[in-house]
Protein backbone atom coordinates (compact mmCIF):
# COMPACT_ATOMS: atom_id res chain seq x y z
CA UNK A 1 0.00 0.00 0.00
CA UNK A 2 1.20 3.49 -0.77
CA UNK A 3 2.79 5.53 1.97
CA UNK A 4 0.39 7.90 3.70
CA UNK A 5 2.63 10.93 3.28
CA UNK A 6 2.00 14.28 1.67
CA UNK A 7 3.69 15.06 -1.63
CA UNK A 8 4.00 18.14 -3.78
CA UNK A 9 2.78 16.07 -6.71
CA UNK A 10 -0.86 14.94 -6.41
CA UNK A 11 -1.28 11.17 -6.06
CA UNK A 12 -2.48 9.25 -9.11
CA UNK A 13 -4.64 6.25 -9.78
CA UNK A 14 -2.48 3.22 -10.60
CA UNK A 15 -4.74 2.36 -13.52
CA UNK A 16 -2.92 -0.72 -14.77
CA UNK A 17 -2.92 -2.37 -11.35
CA UNK A 18 -6.64 -1.70 -10.97
CA UNK A 19 -7.26 -3.20 -14.40
CA UNK A 20 -5.29 -6.32 -13.40
CA UNK A 21 -7.24 -6.54 -10.13
CA UNK A 22 -10.60 -6.46 -11.91
CA UNK A 23 -9.46 -8.78 -14.69
CA UNK A 24 -8.49 -11.32 -12.00
CA UNK A 25 -11.94 -10.93 -10.46
CA UNK A 26 -13.45 -11.53 -13.89
CA UNK A 27 -11.41 -14.52 -15.02
CA UNK A 28 -10.44 -16.46 -11.87
CA UNK A 29 -12.04 -17.80 -8.71
CA UNK A 30 -12.64 -15.21 -6.01
CA UNK A 31 -10.97 -15.56 -2.57
CA UNK A 32 -12.72 -17.93 -0.16
CA UNK A 33 -14.37 -15.19 1.99
CA UNK A 34 -16.69 -14.46 -0.97
CA UNK A 35 -18.18 -17.97 -0.76
CA UNK A 36 -20.68 -16.89 1.88
CA UNK A 37 -21.97 -14.22 -0.51
CA UNK A 38 -22.51 -16.49 -3.49
CA UNK A 39 -26.24 -15.69 -3.54
CA UNK A 40 -25.30 -12.12 -4.56
CA UNK A 41 -23.21 -13.20 -7.54
CA UNK A 42 -25.00 -10.74 -9.85
CA UNK A 43 -23.80 -7.89 -7.65
CA UNK A 44 -20.17 -8.98 -7.87
CA UNK A 45 -20.48 -9.47 -11.62
CA UNK A 46 -21.85 -5.96 -12.03
CA UNK A 47 -19.07 -4.44 -9.91
CA UNK A 48 -16.49 -6.27 -12.03
CA UNK A 49 -17.85 -5.43 -15.47
CA UNK A 50 -18.75 -1.86 -14.53
CA UNK A 51 -15.29 -1.27 -13.03
CA UNK A 52 -13.65 -2.48 -16.23
CA UNK A 53 -15.98 -0.18 -18.15
CA UNK A 54 -14.98 2.83 -16.01
CA UNK A 55 -11.35 1.89 -16.68
CA UNK A 56 -12.09 1.74 -20.46
CA UNK A 57 -11.42 -1.99 -20.81
CA UNK A 58 -13.67 -3.39 -23.59
CA UNK A 59 -15.40 -6.76 -23.40
CA UNK A 60 -14.87 -9.35 -26.12
CA UNK A 61 -17.90 -10.43 -28.20
CA UNK A 62 -17.75 -13.83 -26.48
CA UNK A 63 -17.79 -12.22 -23.03
CA UNK A 64 -20.71 -9.98 -23.96
CA UNK A 65 -22.73 -12.94 -25.21
CA UNK A 66 -21.89 -15.02 -22.13
CA UNK A 67 -22.89 -12.22 -19.75
CA UNK A 68 -26.19 -11.74 -21.53
CA UNK A 69 -27.07 -15.45 -21.50
CA UNK A 70 -26.16 -15.80 -17.83
CA UNK A 71 -28.11 -12.74 -16.70
CA UNK A 72 -31.25 -13.79 -18.57
CA UNK A 73 -30.95 -17.31 -17.12
CA UNK A 74 -31.53 -15.74 -13.69
CA UNK A 75 -34.81 -14.06 -14.64
CA UNK A 76 -37.64 -15.31 -12.44
CA UNK A 77 -40.81 -16.54 -14.17
CA UNK A 78 -42.94 -14.33 -11.91
CA UNK A 79 -40.87 -11.19 -12.52
CA UNK A 80 -37.50 -9.84 -11.41
CA UNK A 81 -34.11 -11.53 -11.25
CA UNK A 82 -32.45 -13.89 -8.77
CA UNK A 83 -28.99 -13.05 -7.43
CA UNK A 84 -27.55 -16.41 -8.48
CA UNK A 85 -28.56 -20.03 -8.89
CA UNK A 86 -27.34 -20.83 -5.37
CA UNK A 87 -30.76 -21.42 -3.83
CA UNK A 88 -32.21 -23.60 -6.57
CA UNK A 89 -32.24 -27.37 -6.08
CA UNK A 90 -30.03 -29.69 -8.13
CA UNK A 91 -31.58 -30.13 -11.56
CA UNK A 92 -33.90 -27.17 -11.04
CA UNK A 93 -33.90 -24.19 -13.37
CA UNK A 94 -31.69 -21.46 -11.88
CA UNK A 95 -34.47 -18.92 -12.17
CA UNK A 96 -36.65 -20.86 -9.71
CA UNK A 97 -34.97 -19.15 -6.78
CA UNK A 98 -36.27 -15.95 -5.20
CA UNK A 99 -36.12 -12.70 -7.13
CA UNK A 100 -35.03 -9.58 -5.25
CA UNK A 101 -34.69 -5.87 -5.96
CA UNK A 102 -30.90 -5.67 -5.80
CA UNK A 103 -30.40 -8.53 -8.25
CA UNK A 104 -32.95 -7.03 -10.64
CA UNK A 105 -31.17 -3.66 -10.59
CA UNK A 106 -27.74 -5.18 -11.24
CA UNK A 107 -29.15 -7.44 -13.96
CA UNK A 108 -30.41 -4.47 -15.98
CA UNK A 109 -27.13 -2.58 -15.54
CA UNK A 110 -25.20 -5.66 -16.68
CA UNK A 111 -27.34 -6.08 -19.78
CA UNK A 112 -26.56 -2.49 -20.68
CA UNK A 113 -22.85 -3.00 -20.05
CA UNK A 114 -22.83 -6.12 -22.24
CA UNK A 115 -24.07 -4.26 -25.33
CA UNK A 116 -21.76 -2.65 -27.88
CA UNK A 117 -22.92 -0.69 -30.90
CA UNK A 118 -26.35 0.73 -31.67
CA UNK A 119 -27.99 -2.53 -32.72
CA UNK A 120 -26.85 -4.40 -29.61
CA UNK A 121 -27.75 -1.47 -27.38
CA UNK A 122 -31.31 -1.23 -28.71
CA UNK A 123 -31.70 -4.98 -28.19
CA UNK A 124 -29.96 -5.11 -24.79
CA UNK A 125 -33.25 -5.63 -22.90
CA UNK A 126 -34.62 -8.17 -25.40
CA UNK A 127 -35.69 -11.15 -23.33
CA UNK A 128 -36.49 -9.06 -20.24
CA UNK A 129 -40.14 -9.49 -19.27
CA UNK A 130 -40.75 -5.80 -18.67
CA UNK A 131 -44.41 -6.08 -17.71
CA UNK A 132 -43.84 -8.85 -15.16
CA UNK A 133 -40.87 -7.04 -13.64
CA UNK A 134 -42.75 -3.74 -13.25
CA UNK A 135 -45.81 -5.52 -11.82
CA UNK A 136 -43.57 -7.47 -9.44
CA UNK A 137 -42.10 -4.21 -8.12
CA UNK A 138 -45.63 -3.02 -7.33
CA UNK A 139 -46.14 -6.13 -5.19
CA UNK A 140 -43.13 -5.06 -3.09
CA UNK A 141 -44.56 -1.65 -2.16
CA UNK A 142 -46.38 -1.35 1.14
CA UNK A 143 -49.28 0.99 1.86
CA UNK A 144 -46.90 3.38 3.67
CA UNK A 145 -44.90 3.82 0.43
CA UNK A 146 -41.88 1.76 1.49
CA UNK A 147 -40.56 -1.22 -0.45
CA UNK A 148 -39.43 -4.62 0.72
CA UNK A 149 -36.65 -6.69 -0.81
CA UNK A 150 -38.80 -9.60 -1.97
CA UNK A 151 -42.03 -11.50 -1.32
CA UNK A 152 -41.84 -14.59 0.89
CA UNK A 153 -44.89 -16.69 1.66
CA UNK A 154 -47.13 -14.00 0.26
CA UNK A 155 -45.69 -11.32 2.56
CA UNK A 156 -43.35 -8.43 1.79
CA UNK A 157 -40.07 -8.95 3.64
CA UNK A 158 -36.77 -7.10 3.95
CA UNK A 159 -37.33 -4.03 6.08
CA UNK A 160 -38.33 -0.51 5.08
CA UNK A 161 -34.96 1.09 4.51
CA UNK A 162 -34.08 3.50 1.72
CA UNK A 163 -32.03 1.00 -0.27
CA UNK A 164 -35.18 -0.68 -1.50
CA UNK A 165 -36.80 2.62 -2.47
CA UNK A 166 -33.66 3.53 -4.41
CA UNK A 167 -33.50 0.22 -6.27
CA UNK A 168 -37.20 0.36 -7.14
CA UNK A 169 -36.84 3.91 -8.44
CA UNK A 170 -33.83 2.96 -10.59
CA UNK A 171 -35.56 -0.07 -12.11
CA UNK A 172 -38.67 2.02 -12.78
CA UNK A 173 -36.60 4.64 -14.63
CA UNK A 174 -34.67 2.05 -16.65
CA UNK A 175 -37.74 0.12 -17.80
CA UNK A 176 -40.92 2.15 -17.60
CA UNK A 177 -40.41 4.96 -20.08
CA UNK A 178 -42.81 7.81 -20.74
CA UNK A 179 -45.75 5.51 -21.44
CA UNK A 180 -49.33 6.74 -21.11
CA UNK A 181 -52.39 4.66 -20.26
CA UNK A 182 -53.82 3.14 -23.42
CA UNK A 183 -50.38 2.49 -24.91
CA UNK A 184 -49.55 -1.15 -25.70
CA UNK A 185 -46.63 -0.89 -23.27
CA UNK A 186 -48.72 0.52 -20.41
CA UNK A 187 -48.19 -1.10 -16.99
CA UNK A 188 -49.72 0.30 -13.82
CA UNK A 189 -47.17 2.36 -11.89
CA UNK A 190 -46.05 2.21 -8.27
CA UNK A 191 -47.50 4.79 -5.89
CA UNK A 192 -44.97 7.56 -6.46
CA UNK A 193 -46.57 10.00 -4.01
CA UNK A 194 -46.41 7.48 -1.17
CA UNK A 195 -42.81 6.61 -2.08
CA UNK A 196 -41.84 10.28 -1.76
CA UNK A 197 -43.75 10.54 1.52
CA UNK A 198 -41.88 7.52 2.90
CA UNK A 199 -38.52 9.05 2.02
CA UNK A 200 -39.59 12.33 3.59
CA UNK A 201 -40.42 10.57 6.86
CA UNK A 202 -36.88 9.15 6.96
CA UNK A 203 -35.10 12.45 7.65
CA UNK A 204 -33.85 12.61 11.24
CA UNK A 205 -33.31 15.40 13.78
CA UNK A 206 -29.65 15.84 12.73
CA UNK A 207 -30.51 16.31 9.05
CA UNK A 208 -29.45 12.83 7.97
CA UNK A 209 -31.62 10.01 6.68
CA UNK A 210 -32.56 6.67 8.22
CA UNK A 211 -35.30 4.07 7.84
CA UNK A 212 -37.48 6.41 9.87
CA UNK A 213 -37.00 9.67 11.76
CA UNK A 214 -36.52 7.69 15.00
CA UNK A 215 -33.58 5.64 13.70
CA UNK A 216 -29.88 6.47 13.44
CA UNK A 217 -28.96 8.54 10.39
CA UNK A 218 -26.57 7.06 7.86
CA UNK A 219 -24.77 8.48 4.80
CA UNK A 220 -25.59 5.40 2.73
CA UNK A 221 -29.30 5.87 3.40
CA UNK A 222 -28.95 9.54 2.48
CA UNK A 223 -27.53 8.55 -0.91
CA UNK A 224 -30.33 6.04 -1.50
CA UNK A 225 -33.01 8.54 -0.49
CA UNK A 226 -31.69 11.31 -2.74
CA UNK A 227 -31.03 8.80 -5.53
CA UNK A 228 -34.60 7.51 -5.35
CA UNK A 229 -36.02 11.03 -5.51
CA UNK A 230 -33.63 12.13 -8.28
CA UNK A 231 -34.59 9.17 -10.47
CA UNK A 232 -38.27 10.03 -10.02
CA UNK A 233 -37.50 13.54 -11.33
CA UNK A 234 -35.10 12.44 -14.08
CA UNK A 235 -36.24 12.81 -17.73
CA UNK A 236 -36.17 9.73 -19.96
CA UNK A 237 -33.20 11.33 -21.72
CA UNK A 238 -30.67 11.77 -18.92
CA UNK A 239 -28.78 14.36 -20.98
CA UNK A 240 -31.67 16.75 -20.34
CA UNK A 241 -32.04 18.66 -17.09
CA UNK A 242 -35.17 17.91 -15.05
CA UNK A 243 -37.93 20.42 -15.82
CA UNK A 244 -39.02 20.14 -12.21
CA UNK A 245 -37.58 18.65 -9.04
CA UNK A 246 -40.88 17.99 -7.36
CA UNK A 247 -39.88 14.68 -5.77
CA UNK A 248 -36.60 16.10 -4.46
CA UNK A 249 -38.32 19.18 -3.06
CA UNK A 250 -41.12 17.21 -1.44
CA UNK A 251 -38.92 14.39 -0.17
CA UNK A 252 -36.33 16.47 1.72
CA UNK A 253 -38.00 18.70 4.31
CA UNK A 254 -34.72 20.00 5.80
CA UNK A 255 -32.27 20.46 2.93
CA UNK A 256 -29.82 22.62 4.91
CA UNK A 257 -29.78 20.06 7.69
CA UNK A 258 -28.89 17.36 5.18
CA UNK A 259 -26.00 19.47 3.84
CA UNK A 260 -24.72 19.93 7.39
CA UNK A 261 -24.97 16.21 8.12
CA UNK A 262 -23.09 15.28 4.95
CA UNK A 263 -20.41 17.95 5.41
CA UNK A 264 -19.83 16.69 8.95
CA UNK A 265 -18.92 13.23 7.66
CA UNK A 266 -15.54 14.54 6.45
CA UNK A 267 -12.67 14.64 8.94
CA UNK A 268 -8.91 14.61 9.07
CA UNK A 269 -7.18 11.25 8.91
CA UNK A 270 -4.71 10.94 11.82
CA UNK A 271 -2.22 8.20 10.96
CA UNK A 272 0.11 8.74 13.93
CA UNK A 273 -2.68 8.63 16.49
CA UNK A 274 -3.92 5.38 14.92
CA UNK A 275 -0.58 3.77 15.70
CA UNK A 276 -0.57 5.02 19.29
CA UNK A 277 -4.16 4.32 20.28
CA UNK A 278 -6.37 1.95 18.29
CA UNK A 279 -9.45 2.93 20.32
CA UNK A 280 -9.26 6.58 19.29
CA UNK A 281 -8.36 6.10 15.61
CA UNK A 282 -10.20 8.35 13.17
CA UNK A 283 -12.76 9.58 15.71
CA UNK A 284 -11.66 13.22 15.82
CA UNK A 285 -13.65 15.50 13.51
CA UNK A 286 -12.25 18.77 12.18
CA UNK A 287 -13.76 22.01 11.00
CA UNK A 288 -14.16 22.14 7.24
CA UNK A 289 -12.09 25.32 7.04
CA UNK A 290 -9.05 23.50 8.46
CA UNK A 291 -8.95 20.71 5.87
CA UNK A 292 -6.67 22.19 3.21
CA UNK A 293 -3.78 19.75 3.79
CA UNK A 294 -3.21 16.10 4.53
CA UNK A 295 -5.61 13.21 4.07
CA UNK A 296 -9.33 13.52 4.74
CA UNK A 297 -11.68 10.56 5.02
CA UNK A 298 -15.40 10.14 5.55
CA UNK A 299 -17.51 8.14 7.93
CA UNK A 300 -21.14 7.13 7.50
CA UNK A 301 -22.39 7.84 11.02
CA UNK A 302 -21.40 9.95 13.98
CA UNK A 303 -18.32 8.76 15.91
CA UNK A 304 -17.30 6.10 13.40
CA UNK A 305 -14.02 5.49 11.60
CA UNK A 306 -13.15 6.55 8.07
CA UNK A 307 -14.15 4.12 5.33
CA UNK A 308 -13.43 4.27 1.59
CA UNK A 309 -17.03 3.69 0.56
CA UNK A 310 -18.27 6.81 2.36
CA UNK A 311 -16.19 8.98 0.07
CA UNK A 312 -18.71 7.75 -2.48
CA UNK A 313 -21.92 7.75 -0.43
CA UNK A 314 -21.34 11.31 0.78
CA UNK A 315 -19.76 12.73 -2.36
CA UNK A 316 -22.34 11.12 -4.63
CA UNK A 317 -25.23 12.45 -2.57
CA UNK A 318 -23.89 16.00 -2.62
CA UNK A 319 -23.28 15.72 -6.37
CA UNK A 320 -26.93 14.80 -6.95
CA UNK A 321 -27.97 17.74 -4.77
CA UNK A 322 -25.73 20.08 -6.77
CA UNK A 323 -23.59 20.92 -3.73
CA UNK A 324 -20.38 18.95 -4.18
CA UNK A 325 -18.37 22.06 -3.24
CA UNK A 326 -19.50 21.57 0.37
CA UNK A 327 -16.69 19.05 0.82
CA UNK A 328 -12.95 19.49 0.28
CA UNK A 329 -12.16 17.18 -2.65
CA UNK A 330 -8.30 17.25 -2.95
CA UNK A 331 -7.54 15.85 0.54
CA UNK A 332 -10.33 13.30 0.09
CA UNK A 333 -8.74 12.19 -3.16
CA UNK A 334 -5.38 11.92 -1.38
CA UNK A 335 -7.00 9.76 1.29
CA UNK A 336 -8.34 7.30 -1.28
CA UNK A 337 -5.17 7.16 -3.38
CA UNK A 338 -2.53 7.34 -0.64
CA UNK A 339 -4.23 5.47 2.20
CA UNK A 340 -6.61 2.83 0.80
CA UNK A 341 -5.32 2.22 -2.76
CA UNK A 342 -3.72 -1.22 -2.56
CA UNK A 343 -0.44 -2.36 -4.08
CA UNK A 344 -2.17 -5.22 -5.94
CA UNK A 345 -4.92 -2.97 -7.24
CA UNK A 346 -8.33 -2.21 -5.83
CA UNK A 347 -9.09 -0.35 -2.61
CA UNK A 348 -9.37 -1.52 0.97
CA UNK A 349 -12.08 -0.54 3.42
CA UNK A 350 -9.52 1.25 5.61
CA UNK A 351 -5.78 1.50 6.15
CA UNK A 352 -3.95 -1.85 6.32
CA UNK A 353 -6.74 -4.05 5.00
CA UNK A 354 -6.92 -6.10 1.80
CA UNK A 355 -8.85 -4.84 -1.22
CA UNK A 356 -12.38 -6.10 -1.75
CA UNK A 357 -14.79 -5.73 -4.65
CA UNK A 358 -17.29 -3.50 -2.86
CA UNK A 359 -14.80 -0.87 -1.69
CA UNK A 360 -12.73 -1.21 -4.87
CA UNK A 361 -15.71 -0.33 -7.05
CA UNK A 362 -17.01 2.49 -4.87
CA UNK A 363 -13.48 3.89 -4.59
CA UNK A 364 -13.41 4.18 -8.38
CA UNK A 365 -16.89 5.71 -8.34
CA UNK A 366 -15.79 8.32 -5.80
CA UNK A 367 -12.75 9.25 -7.90
CA UNK A 368 -14.87 9.44 -11.05
CA UNK A 369 -17.23 11.82 -9.25
CA UNK A 370 -14.19 13.98 -8.48
CA UNK A 371 -13.39 14.03 -12.22
CA UNK A 372 -10.40 11.65 -12.33
CA UNK A 373 -9.01 11.77 -15.88
CA UNK A 374 -8.23 8.03 -15.92
CA UNK A 375 -11.90 7.12 -15.55
CA UNK A 376 -15.01 7.57 -17.66
CA UNK A 377 -17.61 10.12 -16.64
CA UNK A 378 -19.94 8.72 -13.99
CA UNK A 379 -23.72 8.78 -13.78
CA UNK A 380 -23.98 9.46 -10.06
CA UNK A 381 -27.63 8.39 -9.80
CA UNK A 382 -27.12 4.92 -11.28
CA UNK A 383 -23.47 4.52 -10.17
CA UNK A 384 -22.27 3.49 -13.62
CA UNK A 385 -20.63 5.31 -16.50
CA UNK A 386 -22.68 7.87 -18.41
CA UNK A 387 -21.91 5.81 -21.49
CA UNK A 388 -23.68 2.83 -19.89
CA UNK A 389 -26.67 5.03 -19.05
CA UNK A 390 -26.97 6.00 -22.71
CA UNK A 391 -26.95 2.29 -23.61
CA UNK A 392 -29.73 1.67 -21.09
CA UNK A 393 -31.79 4.49 -22.61
CA UNK A 394 -31.42 2.93 -26.06
CA UNK A 395 -32.25 -0.50 -24.61
CA UNK A 396 -35.45 0.90 -23.08
CA UNK A 397 -36.44 2.51 -26.38
CA UNK A 398 -35.72 -0.71 -28.27
CA UNK A 399 -37.74 -2.78 -25.82
CA UNK A 400 -40.72 -0.43 -26.02
CA UNK A 401 -40.57 -0.49 -29.82
CA UNK A 402 -40.46 -4.28 -29.73
CA UNK A 403 -43.51 -4.41 -27.46
CA UNK A 404 -45.35 -2.14 -29.88
CA UNK A 405 -44.40 -4.43 -32.74
CA UNK A 406 -42.10 -1.91 -34.43
CA UNK A 407 -38.80 -3.75 -34.02
CA UNK A 408 -37.55 -7.28 -33.28
CA UNK A 409 -35.03 -8.03 -30.57
CA UNK A 410 -31.96 -10.27 -30.69
CA UNK A 411 -34.02 -13.44 -30.42
CA UNK A 412 -35.99 -12.45 -33.52
CA UNK A 413 -33.08 -11.67 -35.82
CA UNK A 414 -30.72 -14.44 -34.73
CA UNK A 415 -28.02 -12.07 -33.49
CA UNK A 416 -26.95 -14.54 -30.84
Where are each of the predicted segments found?
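Preference for long, amphipathic alpha-helical scaffolds in soluble/luminal domains
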Residues: 1-416
Amino acid sequence: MADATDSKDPPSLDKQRHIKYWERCHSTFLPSPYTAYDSTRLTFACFTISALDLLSVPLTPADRAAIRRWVLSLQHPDGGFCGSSTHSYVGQDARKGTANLAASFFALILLGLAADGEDEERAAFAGVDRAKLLRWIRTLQRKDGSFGQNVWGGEIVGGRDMRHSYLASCIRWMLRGDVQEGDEAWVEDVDVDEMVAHVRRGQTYDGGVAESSQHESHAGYAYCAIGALSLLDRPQDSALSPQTQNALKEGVPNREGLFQFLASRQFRYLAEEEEEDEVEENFIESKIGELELGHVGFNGRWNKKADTCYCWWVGGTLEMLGNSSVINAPPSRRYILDITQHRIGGFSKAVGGPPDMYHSYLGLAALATMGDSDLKELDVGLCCSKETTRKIERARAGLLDSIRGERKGWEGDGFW
